[in-house]
């Protein structure tokens, strides 16, 4: 029988919260040109806290979101090293950036609902 250990799930949630704050501070302080056009909408950390998926929302619609995410993924090792300075963790998870499209989907659905009324 497999026993559920709530501490493992709780640990990944705590790491995700701390990682989200550290990434936000890093983008504000060191990557100021990026911080004005993107925001971190969420961080999901694996149960073993070795990998983290960072969901990024692009505020500026003139910028291609896929290019920004590709650039962030290319620089993920240097971003990870910079995040290490902000965190007091033994191991900083590997960062994988993804474009967050939930807000765009919400806007599209609300526009459709507004036109049907």
Swiss-Prot record:
Pfam families hit by this protein: RBFA
Compartment(s) where it occurs, according to its Swiss-Prot or TrEMBL record: Cytoplasm
Keyword Phosphoprotein applies: no
Gene Ontology terms: biological process: maturation of SSU-rRNA
Family matches, as PROSITE patterns: RBFA
Keywords associated with the record: Cytoplasm, Ribosome biogenesis
GO cellular component: cytosol
MF GO annotations: ribosomal small subunit binding
Signal peptide: none
Record carries keyword Coiled coil: no
PANTHER family: RIBOSOME-BINDING FACTOR A, CHLOROPLASTIC-RELATED (PTHR33515:SF1)
Sequence similarity: Belongs to the RbfA family.
Reported function: One of several proteins that assist in the late maturation steps of the functional core of the 30S ribosomal subunit. Associates with free 30S ribosomal subunits (but not with 30S subunits that are part of 70S ribosomes or polysomes). Required for efficient processing of 16S rRNA. May interact with the 5'-terminal helix region of 16S rRNA.
UniProt subunit comment: Monomer. Binds 30S ribosomal subunits, but not 50S ribosomal subunits or 70S ribosomes.
Name of the protein in its database record: Ribosome-binding factor A
High-level lineage: Bacteria, Pseudomonadati, Pseudomonadota, Alphaproteobacteria, Rickettsiales
Gene giving rise to this polypeptide: rbfA
